[in-house]
Amino acid sequence: MTKLSRRELGRLAAGLMAARAARLEAQPPAPSEYVGPLTGVEKGLEDRRFDPVAYTLDLYAAAPRRLGFQARTRSEAEAWQQQLRSKLTELVGGFPVEHLPLRPMTLETRTFRGYRREKIVFDSRPGVSVLAYLLLPEQARTPSATLICVPGHGRGVDDIVGIDEHGADRTDKAGYQHDFAIQAAEAGMAAVAIEPMAFGCRRDAITARKGLSTSACQPAAGGALLVGQTMIGWRVWDVMRTLDYIATRAELDSSRVGCMGISGGGTVTLFSTALDTRIRAAFVSGYLNTFRDSVGSLSHCIDNYVPGILNWAEMYDVAGLIAPRPLFVESGERDDIFPIRASIESFTRTREIYSVLGVQDRVEQEVFPGEHSFWGKRGLPFLARHLNA
């Protein structure tokens, strides 16, 4: 037998370790099996249940949904909309009676290829201010059709207006939101991209120190619940105040305003358009689903929840409040937090409401070959068509 030198043994050992590491890297980690206080003592517990989501789904099945859509005529549907819109306003915590002066201010104006971008602030309610970017296309006829653009979870509004994590300009439309406010401007529509409360620069000081993508939704949305309100209601009010701001700008046509958003921004878009009829059309990306299959079954941010809503309505009922105004929905077939089957189900139920109102041609869905991300291939032309009509 040939005796190996110490150096050769070292090389052999290193090679074996590298090969083993490569094999481990190539193999997916084995799922860890839960071991807890009930492991090994399951006998006799067959009729016991410890799963809280299963319990929630039992409650879902028993919930009355007192204002679920049942209308058969246009007049019945319109009466139903009035009832549910009033109840939904109550459920999200209501809105201020007084419209505080906006006190708008332009902080910065910059010119880019094809559009001008203004950084603006205005007041929403006492103690609450909103940051937004206004994107004005060079070639748009004025006053211009305008889109209120609401980002989903992540870095906030910068992620939809071409600003990277270092505050520098970018042109590659990176990230899951693909700078969709810029895409709106490139499609010839003005865009007012707002920073949602608890996102980006509108986070609390403690959370902001933890990094750009650290969510502040937990303390803020939790605080809203403690006073009988909701983060959804707060963000919808910001959209309503954005509509007020648009009405102050001569370049913008306040009678041709749409709203669009993805994920958490899709939540805000759906509820805002349902509750404020000044919004003429909506584009909801990566959100329309059922409460049962999304926020009722999967882990989601607390800002998605409206206490008691399932006693009155499902998500498709909320979507039905948008009718007869145009609504476009897009869903990724591999979206893992808003499952596609339930998205299609919810859209089908929404279309039934549009059908009773005689406007089934004003609601569309695109299922695209992707995950939880903005697509926009048909949605943006849909908005342009309806807002420029």
Where are these regions (language model features)?
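C-terminal catalytic histidine-bearing segment of alpha/beta-hydrolase fold enzymes
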Residues: 348-349, 353-389
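Alpha/beta-hydrolase fold nucleophile elbow
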Residues: 252-261
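Proline/glycine-enriched tight loop/beta-turn segments at coil->beta junctions
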Residues: 127-128, 138-146
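Mobile cap/lid helix-loop segments that gate and shape the active-site cleft of serine hydrolases
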Residues: 219, 223-227, 241-242, 279-320, ...
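N-terminal secretory signal peptides and thylakoid transit peptides that target proteins
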Residues: 1-17
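Short beta-strand/loop motif that positions the catalytic acidic residue
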Residues: 329-331
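Cap/lid segment of the alpha/beta-hydrolase catalytic domain
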Residues: 150-237, 294-296
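Non-catalytic accessory segments flanking enzyme active sites
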Residues: 57-135
